[in-house]
Each structure stands twice: as C-alpha cells, then as structure tokens.
Amino acid sequence: MKYWGTALLGAFCVFFFTPNTAYAMHIAEGFLPAGWCLFWLALSVPFVFWGIRSIHISLRGNPHLKMLLGLAGAFVFVLSALKIPSVTGSCSHPTGVGLGAILFGPAVMSVLGCIVLLFQALLLAHGGITTLGANVFSMGVMGPLVSYGVYQLLKKRNTKVAVFLAASLGNMTTYMVTSLQLAMAFPDKTGNLLVSFFKFMSIFAITQIPLAITEGLLTVFVFNLLNNYREELYPGLPKEERSGPYDFVN
C-alpha cells in the first residue's frame, strides 16, 4: 500500500503541479474587502468549533484513529497544493476533502481544512490570512457537507460510485461557493449577482471539471487501499468496535 500510494500521488503531483507563483491558491490575501472577510470568518468559526468537538469525541473513544485522521489531513494538503491558475485572485486545484468527509464526517473536515489552509497561507503563500474564513467555508465546510451527503445517499447501492461522486461533487461544490464569494464581492457592472456568478463559474469550469473527475478516481483508489488494508490499520481491533462515520472500517 505504501509504495503504490506514494507512486500514484507522485505521478499526480508531476502531472498537475505548475511552478507559476503569480497566482495564490484559493482566494488570495487581500483580494476580498474587509467586510466580506469578516462575514465568511463568522460563518466558518461555528463549524470549526463543531469539528473540534467531533474530533475530541472520536479520538476519546477510538484513539487508534489518529493515524487515519493524519492521513486524511495529508491527503487534503497534498491535493490542494496542486494549483492551476484560473480566475484572477484564485486558481483551480483538487481539494481532497471528499475522502476525509467519507471517513469521519463533515465536521472533522472543517478543522482539517482550516489547518491545511493556514499552513499553506503561512508556509507556501497560497491563499491568505484575511481570506482564511472564506476559503475554509468553501473547501472545509460546504465541500465536505456535499461529499458526506452524496456518499451517505448512494453507499448502499454502489460504494465505488458513491465515493467517486462524493469526491467529485464535493470538489465542484467548493468552486461553486468560491465563485459565489467572488461574485458577491465583485458583482457585475449591472449589479446582477447571477451574471457575475456564472462568469466566475464558467472560467473555473474549464479546469475544474477535469480536476473533479480525476480527484474522484484518485479518491476511489485510495479508499479501496484503505479498505483492503484495514486489518493493518487496526491490528487486534474487533470488527464490532470499528464503528462510526468512518465507514470503510465497518
């Protein structure tokens, strides 16, 4: 599992990574007016606190999940660091939040998303501190909520299809929300919010639809690896104790 996973992620990085540093990941530092920065921050904070509580409850009853939680966070960090310049002040990239939402639920991903976005803003100059709330809301809140809902709705019919659609639609949701955030901050000259939204979304779609499909396929691959090696991840743990939103261990 270790070698196959490393090889796949390495190939994915080589294919999608671009050295262009002129664009910031997500919404760039200073790009949103202060009022909108505060607005999105206020919307994101309750979800982050909800996620902290959820992580505390999960790890208190199942401390062995720390490694899996770290893996979900690393998956988000690696995939969301692969950027393709798109709309001015932002860019297109995979998000990686679908896997964690499937395994742990949407609340946990708000915390992991916040940590990843903060590290990337501080260490990689991707995104920003002032726009952290907006980026957390799009990638750490709305994307995982859709991914989790899609997976729960379809998992009993076909698990692989459910994982693929959950990851892909979670990715697209992130960019729909980002387009809405940009449209609200920078409406069309006519003042029509929908016109501005569809302008941003149409530009994102050129790169984001192929990325969403690719992320869905990669997430299915990683999900299957985790499922196949669950005995190694949980040595000696009775099957009846493998419960919770992390479905692959059931």
Swiss-Prot record:
Q: What is its main location?
A: membrane
Q: Hey, which pathway is this one from?
A: Cofactor biosynthesis; adenosylcobalamin biosynthesis
- Gene3D superfamilies in UniProt: 1.10.1760.20
Q: Which residues form the signal peptide?
A: 1-24
Report the record's Gene Ontology biological process terms: cobalamin biosynthetic process
* Top-level lineage group: Bacteria
Q: Does the keyword Transit peptide apply?
A: no
Ranges annotated as spanning the membrane: 32-52, 67-87, 99-119, 122-142, 161-181, 203-223
Has keyword Ion transport? yes
Keywords for this protein? Cell membrane, Cobalamin biosynthesis, Cobalt, Cobalt transport, Ion transport, Membrane, Signal, Transmembrane, Transmembrane helix, Transport
Q: State its role.
A: Part of the energy-coupling factor (ECF) transporter complex CbiMNOQ involved in cobalt import.
Q: Which family does it belong to?
A: Belongs to the CbiM family.
Known partners and oligomeric status = Forms an energy-coupling factor (ECF) transporter complex composed of an ATP-binding protein (A component, CbiO), a transmembrane protein (T component, CbiQ) and 2 possible substrate-capture proteins (S components, CbiM and CbiN) of unknown stoichimetry.
What is the name attached to this protein's record? Cobalt transport protein CbiM
